[in-house]
């Protein structure tokens, strides 16, 4: 699956899976918001079976976006990939419409207008910056301490086809440092990042058109 990287290991993995899940209310199959824009999606079992150990360094930080209605499934994927959870809401995207109004999203219980990303670790990765924006003020002394907090809460407009704002990539780098890093399920080439997915470059082409 990751043969193209020739055994290279990464200290930061940023992932936005196209989650596939069953909708018990309708009896049908649904996809996450991002999944509607991918050519293919992956079931939880397929995600769990990904050979992440082939690309994860011994000391590695994982940032993974997940579906709010599937927290346990997300935790199962994190565990299967060999990581330990540090924060279910390490990154939070509060979505705005093109008119700068809070997004009135989908949901059967409440209408979601945000997405969250898990932060998890493998080994003992170092924190490059002690000034990553957080909710509240604190003086962390260790990675375990810094990851007890919500690292970054951003309010940004929704982009093309569920594209996550680039500010989150920048926040990841500020946290982990200028380390070897990869984005999984990427649809956009970004300088400094290795990328993997079946639609790499799709968003670059749209913006260039």
Language-model regions: role of each:
Residues 1-209:
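Class I S-adenosyl-L-methionine-dependent methyltransferase catalytic core
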């Amino acid at each position: 699956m990751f043969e193209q990287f020739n055994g290279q290991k990464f200290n930061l993995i940023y992932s936005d899976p196209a989650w596939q899940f069953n909708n018990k209310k309708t009896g049908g199959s649904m996809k996450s918001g991002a999944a509607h824009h991918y050519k293919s999606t992956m079931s939880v079992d397929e995600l769990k079976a990904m050979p992440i150990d082939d690309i994860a360094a011994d000391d590695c930080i994982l940032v993974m976006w997940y579906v709010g209605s599937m927290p346990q499934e997300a935790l199962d994927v994190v565990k299967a990939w060999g990581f330990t959870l540090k924060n279910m809401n390490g990154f939070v995207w509060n979505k705005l419409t093109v008119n700068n109004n809070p997004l009135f999203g989908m949901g059967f219980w409440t209408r979601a207008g945000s997405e969250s990303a898990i932060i998890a670790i493998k080994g003992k990765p170092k924190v490059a910056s002690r000034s990553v924006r957080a909710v509240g003020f604190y003086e962390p002394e260790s990675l375990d301490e810094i990851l007890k907090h919500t690292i970054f809460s951003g309010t940004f407009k929704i982009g093309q086809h569920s594209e996550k704002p680039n500010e989150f990539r920048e926040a990841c780098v500020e946290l982990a440092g200028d380390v070897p890093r990869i984005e999984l399920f990427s649809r956009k080439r970004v300088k400094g990042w290795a990328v993997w997915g079946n639609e790499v470059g799709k968003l670059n082409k749209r913006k260039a058109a």
